């Protein structure tokens, strides 16, 4: 995957909050947090460079880019974190002002006809059949029309975390995504 575009933008958007959360959650001083962030950037670029390009219709590219950033920071820390503090670190680092705006905006369309159509397209795409760092999912629409469930059968985050030797920390990403979703829905 090319660094320019979304990966570079995500680094610009989130690296400062990642650095701040190194201090808040893990107790690193400002110099150590700066050192970790400085070491994480070339690692992040390397991780991104080793990922294949995502298809234009693949809606999960951002998830993989964010996972790459978290992995780069973890691999740059002097001590491997535990899942629980890493969960808080990632959730807090991702919940920036622009992300809160994005959550409010996207939350207004959840379960709409347009959202459901996009989910059907995602299910049909089966992008992980061609890219091991993407996702495949099965969509289960509720018979009463009240919503749906997406059950993932292939997980790009799991694949990348295994590659990075961080698979045991994968629950931190999923738990933090749930925390972020709750924060987003409570602010909508």
Question: What do these predicted ranges mean?
Answer:
Residues 1-147, 156-174:
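N-terminal accessory segment detector
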Residues 169-173, 183-188:
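C-terminal, beta-strand-rich globular interaction domains
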Residues 178-180:
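Active-site-proximal segments of catalytic enzyme domains
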């Amino acid at each position: 995957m090319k660094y320019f575009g979304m990966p570079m933008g995500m680094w610009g958007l989130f690296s400062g909050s990642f650095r701040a959360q190194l201090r808040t959650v893990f107790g690193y001083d400002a110099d150590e947090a700066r050192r970790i962030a400085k070491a994480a950037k070339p690692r992040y670029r390397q991780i991104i460079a080793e990922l294949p390009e995502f298809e234009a219709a693949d809606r999960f590219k951002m998830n993989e880019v964010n996972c790459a950033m978290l992995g780069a920071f973890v691999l740059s820390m002097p001590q491997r974190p535990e899942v629980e503090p890493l969960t808080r670190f990632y959730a807090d680092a991702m919940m920036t002002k622009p992300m809160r705006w994005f959550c409010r905006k996207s939350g207004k369309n959840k379960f709409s006809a347009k959202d459901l159509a996009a989910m059907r397209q995602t299910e049909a795409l089966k992008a992980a059949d061609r890219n091991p760092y993407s996702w495949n999912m099965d969509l289960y629409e509720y018979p009463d029309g009240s919503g749906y469930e997406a059950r993932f059968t292939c997980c790009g985050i799991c694949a990348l975390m295994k590659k990075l030797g961080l698979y045991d920390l994968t629950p931190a990403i999923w738990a933090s995504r749930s925390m972020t979703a709750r924060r987003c829905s409570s602010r909508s």
